[in-house]
Curated annotation (Swiss-Prot):
It comes from Thermoplasma acidophilum (strain ATCC 25905 / DSM 1728 / JCM 9062 / NBRC 15155 / AMRC-C165). The keyword Cell membrane does not apply. GO terms for cellular component: cytoplasm. This is NH(3)-dependent NAD(+) synthetase. PANTHER family: GLUTAMINE-DEPENDENT NAD(+) SYNTHETASE, NH 3 /GLUTAMINE-DEPENDENT NAD + SYNTHETASE. One of its GO terms (molecular function) is NAD+ synthase activity. ATP binds at residues 27-34, 129, 158, 180. It comes from the Archaea. It is an enzyme of class 6 (ligase). Belongs to the NAD synthetase family. It catalyses: deamido-NAD(+) + NH4(+) + ATP = AMP + diphosphate + NAD(+) + H(+). One of its GO terms (biological process) is NAD biosynthetic process. Mg(2+) binds at residues 33, 134.
């Protein structure tokens, strides 16, 4: 069993080293990953150097507003709120966009633009919130939530993030919430992928940590997602000199 207290200290030291006195800009949603990452930041650098940004849209649930407020108050932080609807609507209107997934990616990339605005104007670095499960599945938007300067929990499976959340005393309402990327109304990660995070973590750990694999349909699905998203985990294709 991993030593999660030691892992918290390791991540905190990593963040201090990488940020090197710069401000930390982080997008928060009221979800488990951004909540844990925000709490880790408070253990790493002075609170006045942390800039949390909440970027809701018309599909954002009231529970998310409540959880963002609850968490930031608990951590002694002040957050910025920027609604993304006007910007996203402008893109959708200009492009006559109708594809739900493409519009979801526009939302994610709009949030990235906002975070980099605050980083540019506050001498900061953008802190990402992608976990290892999402990384291996490619379950993130290229140049969207995948666009950042440092990824402090990218080596942790979703199950590990929950273990850290317990130690960091993340509010129970956040712990119990169904994970969602919030890209369209009613979307949840597990429904979209078609299996629980516990199943995903077990399969990914079997394949990438233990080197074991079988021909069960769920293994094939996970490996197909990994293969199709390979481009997200690599630099753009280019010719060698």
């Amino acid at each position: 069993m991993p030593d999660y207290m030691q892992e918290i200290e390791r991540i905190s030291e990593f963040l201090r080293k990488v940020l090197q006195g710069k401000n930390a800009v982080i997008g928060i949603s009221g979800g488990i990953d951004s909540s844990v990452t925000l709490a880790l930041l408070t253990r790493s650098i002075p609170k006045e150097r942390i800039i949390p940004v909440f970027m809701p849209d018309r599909n954002t649930q009231q529970a998310d507003y409540d959880d963002v407020q609850k968490l930031t108050q608990k951590l002694g932080l002040t957050y910025r709120e920027v609604r993304i609807d006007p910007m996203v609507d402008s893109f959708v209107s200009t492009l006559a966009a109708t594809d739900r997934a493409a519009i979801g990616n526009i939302k994610s990339r709009t949030r990235m633009i906002i975070l980099y605005y605050f980083a540019n104007t506050n001498g900061g670095m953008v802190v990402g919130t992608t976990n290892r499960t999402e990384l291996l599945l490619g379950y993130f938007t290229k140049y969207g939530d995948g666009g950042c300067d440092v990824e402090p929990i990218e080596h942790l499976y979703k199950r590990d993030v929950y273990e850290l959340a317990k130690i960091l005393d993340i509010p129970e309402s956040i712990m119990k919430k169904k994970p969602t990327a919030g890209l369209w109304a009613g979307q949840t990660d597990e429904d979209e992928i078609g299996m629980s995070y516990a199943q995903m973590d077990e399969i990914l750990s079997d394949v990438f940590d233990k080197g074991t694999y079988n021909d069960k349909p769920e293994y094939k699905k996970i490996m197909e997602m990994h293969s199709l998203s390979d481009h997200k985990r690599n630099l753009p294709y280019s010719l060698k000199k």
